Amino acid sequence: MALHFQSLAELEVLCTHLYVGTDLTERIEAEKALLELIDSPECLSKCQLLLEQGTTSYAQLLAATCLSKLVTRINPLPIEQRIDIRNYILNYVASQPKLAPFVIQALIQVIAKLTKLGWFEVQKDEFVFREIIADVKKFLQGTVEHCIIGVIILCELTQEMNLVDYSRPSAKHRKIATSFRDTSLKDILVLACSLLKQVLAKPLNLQDQDQQSLVMQVLKLVLSCLNFDFLGSSADESADDLCTVQIPTTWRTIFLEPETLDLFFNLYHSLPPLLSQLALSCLVQFASTRRSLFSSPERAKYLGNLIKGVKRILENPQGLSDPGNYHEFCRFLARLKTNYQLGELVLVKEYAEVIGLIANFTITSLQHWEFAPNSVHYLLTLWQRMVASVPFVKSAEPHLLDTYAPEITKAFITSRLESVAIVVRDNLEDPLDDTATVFQQLEQLCTVSRCEYEKTCTLLVQLFDQNAQNYQKLLHAAPGLAVDMAIQEGRLAWLIYLVGTVVGGRLTYTSTDEHDAMDGELSCRVFQLISLMDTRLPHCTNEKIELAVLWFLDQFRKTYVGDQLQRTSKVYARMSEVLGITDDNHVLETFMTKIVTNLKYWGRCEPVISRTLQFLSDLSVGYILLKKLVKIDAVKFMLKNHTSEHFPFLGISETYNVGDFRCRTTFYTALTRLLMVDLGEDEDEFENFMLPLTVSFETVLQIFNNNFKQEEVKRMLIGLARDLRGIAFALNTKTSYTMLFDWIYPAYLPVLQRAIERWYGEPACTTPILKLLAELMQNRSQRLNFDVSSPNGILLFREASKMICTYGNQILSLGSLSKDKIYPMKLKGISICYSALKSALCGNYVSFGVFKLYGDNHFDNVLQAFVKMLLSVSHSDLLQYRKLSQSYYPLLECLTQDHMSFITNLEPPVLLYVLTSLSEGLTTLDTVVSSSCCTSLDYMVTYLFKHIAKEGKKPLRSREAMQAGQRLLHFMQQNPDVLQQMMSVLMNTIVFEDCRNQWSVSRPLLGLILLNEKYFSELRASLINSQPLPKQEVLGQCFRNLMEGVEQNLSVKNRDRFTQNLSVFRRDVAEALRSDGHTDLSSLDMMS
């Protein structure tokens, strides 16, 4: 779409396609046109045309979108133009306050971005973009509509100041945000609070939409102020339960005034739910205020006011019937315990009354289990932390938790059991299906349940016996009672979960022998129920009960089975009488019997199988447990009979989901750990263990050769690859790994190679095979350090080379792929290939020099495949997909460390691509990637420096090595900006960024400085000259100190000296730049 002839009508059609169009092609074309419009010299005039003459809100929105992108470009518009845009928008929204809300919001975002990016810019000795605060006050003096716009401007500005733009240096963002915090944020909060006081001072007309909108925007403004990232810690907002608000000390007076908290509690009681929940959100932040803001007496008084507010809300609970209010109030209660100690809470005058009200509120909430289930998390967090604090309370005041905690536990237990009948009869969504939430709530409950444990245990025993009896009656009753049976099974599932929870609670709370005996009473009943239900397999099954049983078994394992636990635990006293289980050896037998039973009868139920196998895997970690396990008959049976005949989940029927095959890796990892206990050097034992896989591979070979049943072969190979990966993962000794290698090579690796050739376009097949290859290449625990007479290392690498080359060549034939397919179809496989190659190059089990010596091209071939695959990937994709970047950059590090001859032989465009990828990787937030980039760059710079240093001297190196160095030097001379750009990036990181890998950054920086002293001098002068005169001398001294004692070489001693100097330099420069002078931050950017 050519832009030069676009009329207003054509632009409005573009808007329609962009915002409300349903045709995907038209929308993509509109997006392209939008990008062209932003780059067009006519952009501003077109935006003005749309704003002033556009007939739809979408036209105005397009103008705002274009302006937003225009003002945030890396190369900013002239300051005069930006001031004009800011003033134009202010006048525009002031003259048209009835614009669509989303248009006003979008235009105000442009003002906020302009203000943030120009915060330090000076014109005629004034910070021109800071005048926005004064401009807003004019809006606040106008109509209600103008007042709303003014508040939205302040709210957007506060949020924009708090927003980290990862495309710009984080240190610049922090400097702007800190200056805004120190100069403006407190005034904005005071202004917002005064507006709210004015609202409360006169009768509220809740029918007036404008007034409601004003109150909403002011509350959002207060919340933005309190949510500000005051310290620049960028805490993860999802970590809601651990948040402390780092209020600046200068705000103390606001927080010490009781009227401040009263204002928000009064607003909660006065406003309708949509607004009152915002008032509660503000109170959540007030309750989270850092403790150190107050002295001890002040903190006690502040806490007292918070508790009074809680009491008033709970005594007038009508507002809590709204889910939004209810959720925020639950968060508020949780934050109280996060920020205040139980010892402080019990000293509050109203504590006894309020803890009773909170307990009743919690019990009511638990009983109404279907109402706002996500909010229960916060209530359980409160009680969990209260109970966990009991041992540390030194106050004589009663905490009353021994009264209320058992009631909370009882309410949870009874409410969950009562919910089952409602869920089954009304066909509602079952809370048990959301296992993540169930596990989270149970882990919180386990601490609470151990407080006054006798009461909880008595209740559970009574309920379990009653429900078990009802279940047995139903088993012997006439058919046709399916609903009653479903209810009873659901109740039993909850009870098993709950028993597992309270048993697991032993680890979180002080326990006695009597408590252990109670655990035995409860556990007895679950083990009896397990036996009863397993006798009814396979005819009667219940997935929920099985998952609950596995939870219980895992909790019992963690609590009572292990190396460090006492063998004489009282838990076994009752279990010995009833079940004959006298110690953890007997328990392990029960565990393994249950595991084998599940694997036999639950083969097609993926949740049960995967949880069972995870339980088996957890059991198989730890030598002492393994020694006990291998003596158990059930384990011996598994080691000899791991076939689909005995364990159906190992089958390959077309009715089975290929995705479920993943669990086979877990199974074989655990099984191989068990095999390894007594394997030693017994090759016959290993051959017997591998027999089922041998049979499968021979079948595959036969079918492959006859060229039929290809779908069956593919499924078999997927399963075999996953099995072998599990086996290879567990073989961590040279002897055992050699047995596997001798088994798989040369007989079966070529089969996998053929599979890659045939099904290269099917990730379901190629991914397991490539992951197996990557595992085989891992020299974990030096397992691949074969004997000196063995060629196995080279043979393994040759096979890996063939497979990577085959995959690389075939995958490129797929051509271009859509965004949603490019990772699963192509990039995932490439990342696994790179990971495998990296393991080979760094594994130290292959002498790569022999390949060229003997004319073997496998090494060269795999490196060429690496290059071909790399060139098919864009730089943005390299960094966007984490697994790809975390395999590519460490691989490049290996290549630059040991194979610089390969790097120097790359064609100039390829070398430029590699160096550009390094440069972009240096700026990423992923420290694994950025550190790898620094190391790779250091190897390259060191190689180049050494070559230059040896020029003109008598050559000790081969002519070939000299030519390689010369090629790299010539390339750098032809492309001087490459290393200069990287030096700019590293200096920028040191001076302006939150540099988390300073040591890694320092290593290549010295070499870059020594190779580019002239450019380094220019960077130094640029930074120094951008500062006011008083700072110039300080910065000059910082740079002199940086190079003090540093010599013109890259010896380890010299590097270490430079690294030490750099640490001091970074600190001193940060201090020099810290003061809020007239510094234009854009001039400080060494990359601009």
From Swiss-Prot:
Keywords, ordered alphabetically: Acetylation, Cytoplasm, mRNA transport, Nuclear pore complex, Nucleus, Phosphoprotein, Protein transport, Translocation, Transport
Taxonomic superkingdom: Eukaryota
Residue positions where N-acetylalanine is found in the record: 2
Transmembrane segments: none
SMART domains assigned to the protein according to its UniProt record, in alphabetical order: IBN_N
GO molecular function term, any single one: small GTPase binding
Compartments reported by the entry: Cytoplasm; Nucleus; Nucleus, Nuclear pore complex
Any one GO biological process: intracellular protein transport
Annotated GO CC locations: cytoplasm; nuclear pore
A Pfam family this chain is assigned to: IBN_N
Residues modified as Phosphoserine: 569
SUPFAM superfamilies in alphabetical order: ARM repeat (SSF48371)
InterPro entries reported for this sequence: ARM-like (IPR011989), ARM-type_fold (IPR016024), Importin-beta_N (IPR001494), XPO4/7-like (IPR044189)
Primary residence: cytoplasm
Subunit structure: Binds to nucleoporins and the GTP-bound form of Ran.
Family affiliation: Belongs to the exportin family.
PANTHER family: EXPORTIN 4,7-RELATED, RAN-BINDING PROTEIN 17
This protein's name: Ran-binding protein 17
Organism annotation: Mus musculus
Lineage, uppermost ranks: Eukaryota, Metazoa, Chordata, Craniata, Vertebrata
